[in-house]
């Protein structure tokens, strides 16, 4: 069952400002091949290259999820935080949007223990925190909030991701280095002031404008959802029947009950 990848046009990329790079003096020469020219001291990204490269990146996201893989969205800069979390949640994937904790991938065992601690705190506090003093409870709530901020997006990941999707490779260089070490492929938006080194699937484009970030995140989440649909199709799940059964549960009445009425 071959689902279509999310559609996007050159015009959408232009409207979102994907073509605006950084000031020419801040450029990274390694990005020279993806630069179309300059305008008013700003490098302009060659969108005729971005289009097929973005398409290839979306294909990888889709294929990874279709094989049952997990995608980890990484974007900790202020203007990426919400878009990254929303897109990952919408497509049942995972995210780091607070601060990359060194060792998140390379020291997964320790990170898993912190996730277990977060789940234990949730349980204790969720059940009314019986027998705790006010002070103990406050300390627990503080620890819970801290862990939730840094690990909330990966608490259900259950193991290493199969693919990273990164916004701003300069800021997230730690994440990329860890993925490289473990052989986890990286899809990333790479601006004109960055190096594409260590990125397996480069998307040349602006990594600062909120509209551009929202567009990448939306497309990647839709590609992941396409992958889930393909995975269900391959597993022989009849999506029509699945929707009908969900509908049935919502109305709370099965055919037998209707017949008995």
UniProtKB/Swiss-Prot annotation:
GO BP field: translation
Swiss-Prot/TrEMBL keywords: Ribonucleoprotein, Ribosomal protein
Entries under PROSITE patterns matching the protein: RIBOSOMAL_S2_2 (PS00963)
Source taxon at top rank: Bacteria
A single GO molecular function term of this UniProt record: structural constituent of ribosome
A UniProt-annotated Pfam family: Ribosomal_S2
Cellular component GO terms, alphabetical: cytosolic small ribosomal subunit
Family, per entry: Belongs to the universal ribosomal protein uS2 family.
Identification of the protein by name: Small ribosomal subunit protein uS2
Organism in which the protein naturally occurs: Paracoccus denitrificans (strain Pd 1222)
Gene: rpsB
């Amino acid at each position: 069952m071959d689902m279509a990848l999310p559609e996007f046009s050159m015009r959408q990329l232009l409207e979102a400002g994907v073509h605006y790079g950084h000031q020419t003096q801040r450029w990274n020469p390694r990005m020279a091949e993806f630069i179309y020219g300059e305008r008013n001291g700003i490098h302009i990204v060659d969108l005729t290259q971005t289009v097929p490269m973005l398409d290839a990146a979306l294909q990888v996201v889709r294929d990874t999820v279709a094989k049952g893989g997990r995608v980890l969205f990484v974007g900790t800069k202020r203007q990426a935080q919400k878009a990254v979390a929303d897109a990952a949640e919408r497509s049942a994937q995972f995210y780091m949007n607070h601060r990359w904790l060194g060792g998140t991938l390379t020291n997964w065992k320790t990170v898993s223990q912190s996730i277990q601690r977060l789940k234990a705190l949730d349980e204790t506090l969720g059940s009314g925190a019986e027998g705790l003093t006010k002070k103990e409870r406050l300390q627990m709530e503080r620890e819970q909030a801290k862990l939730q901020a840094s690990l909330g997006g990966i608490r259900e990941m259950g193991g290493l991701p199969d693919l990273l999707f990164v916004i701003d490779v300069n800021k997230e260089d730690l994440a990329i280095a860890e993925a490289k070490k473990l052989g986890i492929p990286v899809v990333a938006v790479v601006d004109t002031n960055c190096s594409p080194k260590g990125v397996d699937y480069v998307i040349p484009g602006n990594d600062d404008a909120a509209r551009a970030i929202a567009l990448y995140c939306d497309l990647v989440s839709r590609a992941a959802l396409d992958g889930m649909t393909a995975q269900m199709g391959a597993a022989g799940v009849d999506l029509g029947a699945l929707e009908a059964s969900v509908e049935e549960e919502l109305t709370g009445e099965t055919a037998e009950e209707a017949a008995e009425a």
